[in-house]
């Protein structure tokens, strides 16, 4: 399939930004692209055909970001396994990306690529272009995975193992990144991000200095002393962070799906009717598939409690709910298949975020001052949960007695600790502190703003 355009003819660009075709990777890199545009760069955001089929792009008409599409349709049938898909993706996209660059009369000066696609650097440099990786995980997770890549750390670690890494708090085995499915393939995929780390002139991290440069964890400082790392986050729409410095930047402009307008309106009417800090917001991201037993345990807790809740549950997960749960809890609960998470987290009625601790969700909660109850599932979420509970002190991590599920009783103990327990004031105080520091980082003259400005000056 030939390259196509999303918003008109192909325009000359200073920078091409290319994300791996998954929602959690594209959203922060799309937001980073908007920041570059706001500082005067001409930016092309490159997406693949599979992304256009699974995601809704809805940038405002005023956006000057150039969206272009290249094919990732596999040339082989070897995509039944994750390993086969990744191999086919690399083979196909290496070629279509090269063709895209070759087809530009006035080529860009720079490519910013998703760090999970390190081979993009080879494609770029083969055509005389500079390239830089953009890491969508926290600095702490990058630090851990880099040590795994270098051979000084093995994952999974034996139970009850204490892990000490430079400029990090002591970690237990349960705090390390977890790869329950296809562990060898996923591990290789995640650690390959560091295969050409030493060759980059710029390395972008979606975090902010204050968040990972405090006493318990100075990992940004430690890594920046060794590599050209620049923090550029949080990559969240301007309306929620720096008082709308970016025009019309009220949403990511990228959704997995969108409900009917009537249903969307009902969510906000329902939230508006609730008291301040009275609603639990529950969401486990776009990829997590919970065991039916786990969904039921959470439902049993919500049914028996007196707390109001907004629960985002994909259509494929609804069948796991107990019979008549939605009807029996409708007087104080709402179950939806989609919502604007930023709008929900910024609503005065929300008291707590029950989350899987994906990095985007964690950053959004920190940036909007919302305490968390962490129920991590896999990959980086376990490490993020450790920092939420023990380093940033903005919530708790649910303790499991059974490795398979979190019970109703364990959920109740953790959630009540955050919304009603003695520590609730500390959690909220810390959440507000991080909200303030996140805003300062991206505001004019803040640490992330300065780093972006420095990059722009080398390109313009």
Swiss-Prot record:
As its record notes, the protein acts as a catalyst of: mogrol + UDP-alpha-D-glucose = mogroside IE + UDP + H(+); mogroside I-A1 + UDP-alpha-D-glucose = mogroside IIE + UDP + H(+); mogroside II-A1 + UDP-alpha-D-glucose = mogroside IIIX + UDP + H(+); mogroside II-A + UDP-alpha-D-glucose = mogroside III + UDP + H(+)
Which keywords does this Swiss-Prot/TrEMBL entry list? Answer: Transferase
Q: Which residues form a coiled coil?
A: none
Residues given in the record as UDP-alpha-D-glucose binding sites:
286, 339, 341, 359-361, 364, 380-381
Where in the body, by tissue, does this protein show up?
A: Highly expressed in young fruits 15 days after anthesis (15-DAA).
Residues annotated as catalytic: 25 (proton acceptor), 114 (charge relay)
Going by the record, the broad EC class of this enzyme is transferase
Tell me which family the UniProt entry assigns to this protein. Belongs to the UDP-glycosyltransferase family.
Which protein, by its recorded name, is this?
A: Mogroside I-E synthase
Lineage, please? Eukaryota, Viridiplantae, Streptophyta, Embryophyta, Tracheophyta
Please state the gene responsible for encoding this protein.
UGT74-345-2
């Amino acid at each position: 399939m030939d390259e196509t355009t999303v918003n008109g003819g192909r325009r000359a660009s200073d920078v091409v930004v290319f994300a791996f075709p998954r929602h959690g990777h594209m959203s922060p890199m799309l937001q980073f692209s908007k920041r570059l545009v706001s500082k005067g760069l001409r930016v092309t955001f490159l997406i693949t055909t599979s992304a256009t089929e699974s995601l809704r792009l809805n940038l405002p008409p005023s956006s000057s970001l150039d969206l272009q599409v290249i094919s990732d349709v596999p040339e082989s049938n070897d995509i039944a396994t994750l390993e086969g898909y990744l191999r086919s993706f690399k083979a196909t996209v290496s070629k279509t990306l090269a063709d895209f660059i070759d087809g530009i009369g006035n080529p860009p000066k720079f490519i910013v690529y998703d760090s999970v696609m390190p081979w993009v650097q080879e494609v770029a440099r083969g055509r005389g272009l500079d390239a830089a990786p953009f890491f969508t995980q926290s600095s702490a997770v990058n630090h851990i995975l880099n040590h795994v890549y270098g051979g000084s750390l093995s994952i999974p670690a034996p139970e009850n193992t204490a892990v000490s890494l430079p400029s990090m708090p002591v970690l237990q085995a349960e705090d390390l990144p977890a790869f329950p499915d296809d562990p060898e393939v996923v591990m290789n995929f995640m650690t390959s991000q560091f295969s050409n780390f030493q060759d980059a002139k710029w390395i972008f991290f979606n975090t902010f200095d204050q968040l990972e440069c405090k006493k318990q964890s100075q990992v940004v400082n430690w890594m920046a002393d060794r590599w050209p790392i620049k923090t550029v986050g949080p990559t969240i729409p301007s309306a929620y962070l720096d008082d709308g410095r970016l025009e019309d930047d009220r949403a990511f402009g990228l959704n997995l799906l969108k409900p009917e307008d009537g249903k969307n309106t009902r969510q906000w009417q329902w939230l508006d009717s609730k008291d301040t800090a009275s609603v639990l917001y529950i969401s486990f991201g776009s990829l997590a598939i919970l065991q039916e037993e786990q969904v039921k345990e959470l439902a049993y807790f919500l049914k028996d409690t007196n707390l109001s809740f907004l629960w985002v549950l994909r259509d494929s997960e609804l069948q796991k709910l107990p019979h008549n749960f939605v009807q029996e809890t409708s007087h104080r609960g709402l179950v939806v298949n989609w919502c604007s998470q930023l709008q929900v987290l910024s609503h005065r009625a929300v008291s707590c975020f029950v989350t899987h601790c994906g990095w985007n969700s964690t950053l959004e909660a920190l940036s909007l001052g919302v305490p968390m109850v962490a129920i991590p599932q896999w990959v980086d979420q376990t490490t993020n949960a450790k920092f939420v509970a023990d380093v940033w002190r903005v919530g708790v991590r649910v303790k499991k007695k059974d490795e398979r599920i979190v019970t109703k009783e364990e959920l109740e103990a953790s959630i009540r600790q955050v919304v009603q327990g003695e520590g609730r004031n500390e959690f909220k105080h810390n959440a507000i502190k991080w909200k303030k520091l996140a805003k300062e980082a991206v505001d004019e003259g803040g640490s992330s703003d300065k780093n972006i400005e420095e990059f722009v000056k080398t390109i313009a």
